[in-house]
Amino acid sequence: MPNQGEDCYFFFYSTCTKGDSCPFRHCEAAIGNETVCTLWQEGRCFRQVCRFRHMEIDKKRSEIPCYWENQPTGCQKLNCAFHHNRGRYVDGLFLPPSKTVLPTVPESPEEEVKASQLSVQQNKLSVQSNPSPQLRSVMKVESSENVPSPTHPPVVINAADDDEDDDDQFSEEGDETKTPTLQPTPEVHNGLRVTSVRKPAVNIKQGECLNFGIKTLEEIKSKKMKEKSKKQGEGSSGVSSLLLHPEPVPGPEKENVRTVVRTVTLSTKQGEEPLVRLSLTERLGKRKFSAGGDSDPPLKRSLAQRLGKKVEAPETNIDKTPKKAQVSKSLKERLGMSADPDNEDATDKVNKVGEIHVKTLEEILLERASQKRGELQTKLKTEGPSKTDDSTSGARSSSTIRIKTFSEVLAEKKHRQQEAERQKSKKDTTCIKLKIDSEIKKTVVLPPIVASRGQSEEPAGKTKSMQEVHIKTLEEIKLEKALRVQQSSESSTSSPSQHEATPGARRLLRITKRTGMKEEKNLQEGNEVDSQSSIRTEAKEASGETTGVDITKIQVKRCETMREKHMQKQQEREKSVLTPLRGDVASCNTQVAEKPVLTAVPGITRHLTKRLPTKSSQKVEVETSGIGDSLLNVKCAAQTLEKRGKAKPKVNVKPSVVKVVSSPKLAPKRKAVEMHAAVIAAVKPLSSSSVLQEPPAKKAAVAVVPLVSEDKSVTVPEAENPRDSLVLPPTQSSSDSSPPEVSGPSSSQMSMKTRRLSSASTGKPPLSVEDDFEKLIWEISGGKLEAEIDLDPGKDEDDLLLELSEMIDS
């Protein structure tokens, strides 16, 4: 109809995006209708809504099955014109299956078979990159011969065996040169060579014609695996009796019959039978068996030879139509239709004594591997005995080259690193040795021979231990600690005896503590604190080594601990040497301190009131006067101090940097601050104020200030407590006035005083109560706090906090 035209193709079959502007007809009633409107064909359809299609049918879509119906999602089209066998749901609507019946065009079975055969052959050819010679011969014969299909069900021929390539080469030569001699059947000589020479037919009884099984993919794979394992292990002994009993598989798969026939070459020449039999027996290297009677066909005899078994066959069915018998026999024989053709493969392969020896893939791989091995043995004679010949599997034999494992490589790397670190540590220890010897020469003047000998013996022992990287046990560490404590106590016995001779001398010694802190600290802390720190570092070493921490770290730590020990021992020796000069040093230090002398006295008095609460304040005055008297020997002490300053740049004598500690101790102190933030928490405000009061000093010194000031904040209240109980007017006034008056040096000196208090308490045998309390504190801190916090056991936390807040306010 001219005004409406024909139906819009896109609207009819999918969706038209033009909408109203589309010149073609959009009629929803006609969608999916496969009946052409006859009036429209005549050009006189005037209906507004015509249910029939105004479009010629180029295909009969209702007779074509819908492609999408067989897809996982199914057909989702409401107006799908194609044929649907099943009902479907589209947008919640149920659409019934198509009413039209698909016309089944009766195809001739030959055509069906041809179609299926073509698809199978295409699969084979696609799997094999180049068609095997058998298939080539098949293609030649196919055009010339027309063979009737046999009566038995189809057989799946697995032409794409991966390991058949070398056999194909063999068969190629054979097919071209002596085609008749290679065929095992007497009646049919040219045919049915589909996969390889090794796959002959096995079915024996003609009565079992209908019992050919179609193998599934799993069966084929499992047989391949069996075949490989038998080749490696059993050889010919694995031939099972299943060869003679094929499994009957029911199934009307008739379309594959032509597959067999097409991929087979048949020849009906009869003249070559004896030749074939002779060549077959020669090839297999077996005697002929007289199997059954003379009426047995020659096929059976060749089978008996091949399998080495007596075969009894029925005497019927021999006189069937010759062609069919030939076809079935040749099929059975050539295509290997038994249940286990691979077993026969194995025997065949083992017993092959052919004129042309075809190497299998395994043999080739073995040869290559042996060649490689020969080359490698010249290079790697050391590894020769460890290599083993994997003659069973070709894949394994090629990997006989010794490859280092990851762990071996790691071990080698570690070994190299260890050696490098040992060399470094040797250098380090020799450097340390030289430095220490030179320092001893500078500083130790009185007994140089003894000291230098002791020092030089120690580093030598240390270098040995470092070279051997010996992991110490806990018992060894304890023994070493005990020895060290003994040595240090012996070295320091002379000086404490001098100190304890008179109380005045002892007081003077305590005054030196403010600036010449190094001597006394090392003297009194040497026994406990130093041994603790060294034990701690050694324990760390031991744990690090045992837990498998990298050896470089251990050696670095060991170097540090060695340096610490050397410095400690040297300081102890200096200390023992310089004990006669203590008084001079004290006077020198007080003179250097200049202004802070006033504040030093209250600190000392506080300490004395704590330690000796029953003593009167007269002794304090004696002490201060003693300071004035000892100003004569300042020059000598100053010279010795200067010498020490040259030898050790880290030690600074000025009061502004009184906090200087020997460098190895800085790290443990920082650790103590970090690990015991909870202990220090209550003290934080005072510590910050003291840091603000500090003059700008060296960074190393500043790092230690918080801990020092915290010690002060805890120890000052207990020093004030006896001051309140014992009325000492001069001390009180001076100490009260000291915080506002003194700026930087005073605070630092007070901090050094508190440090001295704690160390002195460790050096001297304390009171029993104090001892218990210090033990408790030591347990709480886990042995990490080096300067133990002295607290008065009579006070509880609230009193201490109150006094702290009062101090902060003042």
UniProtKB/Swiss-Prot annotation:
Keywords: Coiled coil, Isopeptide bond, Metal-binding, mRNA transport, Nucleus, Phosphoprotein, Repeat, Transport, Ubl conjugation, Zinc, Zinc-finger
Example of a GO MF term: RNA binding
Ranges of biased composition (kind: Basic and acidic residues): 309-322, 367-390, 417-432
Region of interest: Disordered: 139-194, 223-258, 285-351, 367-432, 482-549, 715-768
Localization per record: Nucleus; Nucleus speckle
Coiled-coil features, chain-numbered ranges: 362-423
GO biological process, one term: poly(A)+ mRNA export from nucleus
UniProt cross-link Glycyl lysine isopeptide (Lys-Gly) (interchain with G-Cter in SUMO2), position: K114, K124, K140, K478, K619
GO cellular component terms listed in the entry, alphabetical order: nuclear speck; nucleoplasm
ZnF bounds (C3H1-type): 2-29, 31-57, 60-86
Modified positions (Phosphoserine) in chain numbering: S108, S132, S149, S171, S290, S370
Residue(s) carrying Phosphothreonine: T321
Residue ranges, compositional bias (Low complexity): 486-498, 729-748
Biased composition regions of type Polar residues, renumbered to the chain: 391-402, 749-762
Gene3D superfamilies to which the protein is assigned, alphabetical: 3.30.1370.210
Acidic residues bias spans: 160-175
Induction remark: By heat shock treatment.
Pfam families: zf-CCCH_3
PANTHER family the record matches: ZINC FINGER CCCH DOMAIN-CONTAINING PROTEIN 11A (PTHR15725:SF2), ZN-FINGER, C-X8-C-X5-C-X3-H TYPE-CONTAINING (PTHR15725)
Subunit structure: Interacts with TREX complex components THOC2, DDX39 and POLDIP3; the interactions are ATP-dependent. Interacts with PABPN1; this interaction retains ZC3H11A in nuclear speckles. Interacts with KPNA3.
Chain's role: Through its association with TREX complex components, may participate in the export and post-transcriptional coordination of selected mRNA transcripts, including those required to maintain the metabolic processes in embryonic cells. Binds RNA. (Microbial infection) Plays a role in efficient growth of several nuclear-replicating viruses such as HIV-1, influenza virus or herpes simplex virus 1/HHV-1. Required for efficient viral mRNA export. May be required for proper polyadenylation of adenovirus type 5/HAdV-5 capsid mRNA.
Protein name, UniProt field: Zinc finger CCCH domain-containing protein 11A
Gene name of this polypeptide: ZC3H11A
